Amino acid sequence: MHAKSLTELRAALDAKECSAVELAQHYLKRIDAARDLNAFVHVDAELTLAQAKAADAALANGEAGPLAGLPIVHKDVFVTRGWRSTAGSKMLANYASPFDATVVARLSAAGMVTLGKTNMDEFAMGSSNENSAFGPVKNPWDTSAVPGGSSGGSSAAVAARLAPAATGTDTGGSIRQPASFAGVTGIKPTYGRVSRYGMIAFASSLDQGGPMARSAADCALLLNAMAGFDERDSTSLERADEDYTRHLGKAWAAGGDAGKPLAGLRIGLPAEYFGAGLADDVRAAIDAALKTYEALGATLVPVSLPKTELSIPVYYVIAPAEASSNLSRFDGVRYGHRAAEYRDLLDMYKKSRAEGFGPEVKRRILVGTYVLSHGYYDAYYLQAQKIRRIIAQDFQEAFKSCDVIMGPASPTVAWDIGAKGDDPVQMYLADIYTLSVSLAGLPGMSVPCGFGAGANAKRPVGLQIIGNYFDEARMLQVADAFQRATDWHVQEPAGV
């Protein structure tokens, strides 16, 4: 059952091969058996089965939508009524939200059944899921490796077939990079496509929610439910609703050849994504994927994104600056961790934050406070915003000669747990290919396209596909065509 896609699972429900309750019980057993992966921070079988019973009733009454009865897990950055919502932090270890995030509410309204809340880097700050207050997550493909971050619990859960779908968030690559490391499909929509209401904020001008699943087709189904205008989110974009599945399985150009479904598609290859720093085994997997696209009729076009290397310093000025503001609300007064002993109000603030936040969060708060301080705001924050605009302009120049841009999602496969913990800069460099997409607010996704070599032969490689603004449906079409021609996305870790 766990090897089926969302569409196949829904067909099984419609054919009464199983009920939503039986499906939920199946996945709950798998989650319990895979506790060593540490992919979950909160599972509540009673809550899950109550939702499954409601889904069965809707299915029986003929009132169910296309996602009714299908299980999903939520990254623990989305507040969820009835469940703890921790953001991977001791600061919120026992926080119970009185409301659902818009993403959670929309998926619940579509009839999906929540299996649990997944582990993550604290406040979404990390690239390996080692920064969680609840311990690191293990990669199901190789349990000595990280699953990527910050949505590492979600990527591990989908990869290990503990859930057919998951939500994640992407601030600088936190859907695409863990999707790459865990061999699953994940999409970061255009900034503003998916509501941030109820998503615990890290960097408000960058944070964006999105789905993770086995395939592009499954992600398209999920995005249909997740996307849309939300008046409660000031950054939500008011656009007509779309069917993100509408191009799947169709030729790129009208009247196209079935043998060459992507004839007419121009794929931009940035020289900056294939230079020094890209591991040979990752390059080999990406090159093989590009050959598949050529066989499907696409044309490869050289493009340039000259400010790519500046995306790291720009991101690590802007994101910490916004984080220092967003996280100032966690002071032990209204909610969150409060120190047990303190002399006065100021001492309570200091001790509560010192005890509640982990090392990486403290590091970024300090950096953010510094770059926003008097005398440094112009030199750092404003300059970073200017370069951010230039990075976005570089993408628009590239899209004049191509329809999508492709390259690696990460310069390497997943590294060993603990390998980069003492060197935050090396950890930051792992996001070199994803940060600029986030800074520009563009949609991007990662699809499985192979594995590493030698000692890394069990560690997946992800192909990053970048689209222009609001072009998710076409981007998903391009990913789906690749997955119809290959089987990387249906391969499973040993023992699954």
From Swiss-Prot:
Gene3D superfamilies: Amidase signature (AS) domain (3.90.1300.10). One of its GO terms (molecular function) is glutaminyl-tRNA synthase (glutamine-hydrolyzing) activity. It comes from the Bacteria. It catalyses: L-glutamyl-tRNA(Gln) + L-glutamine + ATP + H2O = L-glutaminyl-tRNA(Gln) + L-glutamate + ADP + phosphate + H(+). Keywords: ATP-binding, Ligase, Nucleotide-binding, Protein biosynthesis. Coiled coil: none annotated. InterPro entries: Amidase (IPR000120), Amidase_CS (IPR020556), Amidase_dom (IPR023631), AS_sf (IPR036928), GatA (IPR004412). Pfam families: Amidase (PF01425). Signal peptide: none annotated. The active site is at 75 (charge relay system), 150 (charge relay system), 174 (acyl-ester intermediate). One of its GO terms (cellular component) is glutamyl-tRNA(Gln) amidotransferase complex. One of its GO terms (biological process) is translation. It is an enzyme of class 6 (ligase). Its EC number is 6.3.5.7. Belongs to the amidase family. GatA subfamily. Allows the formation of correctly charged Gln-tRNA(Gln) through the transamidation of misacylated Glu-tRNA(Gln) in organisms which lack glutaminyl-tRNA synthetase. The reaction takes place in the presence of glutamine and ATP through an activated gamma-phospho-Glu-tRNA(Gln). Heterotrimer of A, B and C subunits. This is Glutamyl-tRNA(Gln) amidotransferase subunit A. It comes from Burkholderia mallei (strain ATCC 23344). The gene is gatA.
